[in-house]
C-alpha cells in the first residue's frame, strides 16, 4: 500500500476536539434542477438531531442559487452552506469541503426524504461501525461463469449462496460514512475519476470499492428504514433522476468490470446483516424494492 493510499484516521478523536464535531454529522446534498424540492428537504432536515451543518453542492451551473431566499426566511437552527460548482459532475459531492468539520458525513440525494428517527438510529449505528458505509439502500454484484460481473438489486440471486439475501454495497445517496474517505477518494487513480465523469455515474460504487479495499471487510452496513421516501414526482422541474435512464443498470455493470480491471481485484464482500430498530442485528430475507 502506498503512502498516499493509507487508510484515513478513523479512530475516535481526543476530548480536546469540539464535542459538537464528534457527536454530530454534516449533511452533504448535491442538487441539480430541483430548487423547489431542495427547499422542502432543507426545511425537513433542519429538525434532525445531531445535525451540525448542511453543505449544498449546487450543480445548476449558471443558475441562481436559492441562498438569498433561504436566508431571508430564517433564522434557521442549522447553518446551510451553498457550494457553487463550475461543472455538473457527479463526483462534485465527494470533494473535501473546508466547511466540513465533523467526522461523520451524511450524504443524501436531492429527491430523498429520510425520517428523523431513521437518521438518528442510523447515526448511532455508524458510531459503532465508523469505518463502513452505514445506509438504507443495499445493492450487490454477481459474477457469471465467464468472470463478468453484473450489478443488481438486493433480491438478485447470488451464485454459491443458499437461501437469504446478500448485499455487497450500500449506496451513498442515503448513508453515513467517515469524512476521511473523501480524502481517500481524491487519491484514487485518474482512471477511476475519468470513469465517473465518462458515465456521470458510479461514484457510489467507487466508494464501496475503496472502503472494502482498505478495510478488508464488507463495505457497508444495511440499516432497514422505517420511513424513507422518494419525492421526485413532487418537483415542478420535470427533471428525472439518472436512474431512470435505459442504460443506467448497464452502466453500473460496466463500471463494476472497469473498476475490477483498474484495481486488478474485486474487493467487494457479501454481507447479510440487516440492522433494524426492532431487533439488532436481524438476519432475514428482507426484500425492499427502492
Regions found by a protein language model. Give the residues of each.
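C-terminal catalytic/acceptor-binding lobe
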Residues: 1-10, 16-24, 30, 36-43, ...
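Short internal beta-strands
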Residues: 54-59, 135
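A conserved acidic beta->alpha catalytic loop
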Residues: 58-67
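A short, glycine-/small-residue-rich helix N-cap motif at loop->alpha-helix starts
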Residues: 85-92
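Short, acidic, metal-binding catalytic loop of nucleotide-sugar glycosyltransferases
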Residues: 41-53
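Active-site nucleotide-sugar/metal-binding loop of Leloir-type enzymes
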Residues: 94-104
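Conserved catalytic core of nucleotide-sugar-dependent glycosyltransferases
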Residues: 97-98, 108, 112-196, 200, ...
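Structural motif
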Residues: 26, 104-106
